[in-house]
Amino acid sequence: KEGYIVNYHDGCKYECYKLGDNDYCLRECKARYGKGAGGYCYAFGCWCTHLYEQAVVWPLPKKTCN
């Protein structure tokens, strides 16, 4: 599974500005989803890879980013 890491409180994606390989995104993806996860910056959001199937990613149901 893959997807954007999401803030549970406001429903927003984790933003990033350095596209491609990104230490911040990699660190956040691993912290949330475990050391097997990967991450990089895609379309100014942190995109996480190698997630377990039940991982919660953006968008959150009934929670829009505002």
From Swiss-Prot:
Bridged cysteine pairs (disulfide): 12-65, 16-41, 25-46, 29-48
Residues in the signal sequence: none
Alphabetical UniProt keywords: Amidation, Disulfide bond, Ion channel impairing toxin, Neurotoxin, Secreted, Toxin, Voltage-gated sodium channel impairing toxin
SUPFAM superfamilies xrefs: Scorpion toxin-like (SSF57095)
Keyword Secreted among record annotations: yes
Taxonomy of the source species: Eukaryota, Metazoa, Ecdysozoa, Arthropoda, Chelicerata
Tissue specificity as recorded in UniProt: Expressed by the venom gland.
Major place of residence: secreted
A Gene Ontology term for the protein's cellular component: extracellular region
SMART domains registered for this protein in UniProt: Knot1 (SM00505)
Protein name: Beta-toxin Cbo3
Family named by the database record: Belongs to the long (4 C-C) scorpion toxin superfamily. Sodium channel inhibitor family. Beta subfamily.
Domain spans labelled LCN-type CS-alpha/beta: 1-66
Modified residues (Asparagine amide): 66
Gene3D superfamilies membership: Knottin, scorpion toxin-like
Miscellaneous field: Negative results: a mixture of Cbo2 and Cbo3 does not modify the currents of the human voltage-gated sodium channels Nav1.1/SCN1A, Nav1.2/SCN2A, Nav1.3/SCN3A, Nav1.5/SCN5A and Nav1.7/SCN9A.
Subcellular localization(s) per the UniProt record: Secreted
Its biological purpose: Beta toxins bind voltage-independently at site-4 of sodium channels and shift the voltage of activation toward more negative potentials thereby affecting sodium channel activation and promoting spontaneous and repetitive firing. A mixture of Cbo2 and Cbo3 is weakly active on the human voltage-gated sodium channels Nav1.4/SCN4A and Nav1.6/SCN8A when tested at 200 nM. In vivo, is toxic to mice when intraperitoneally injected.
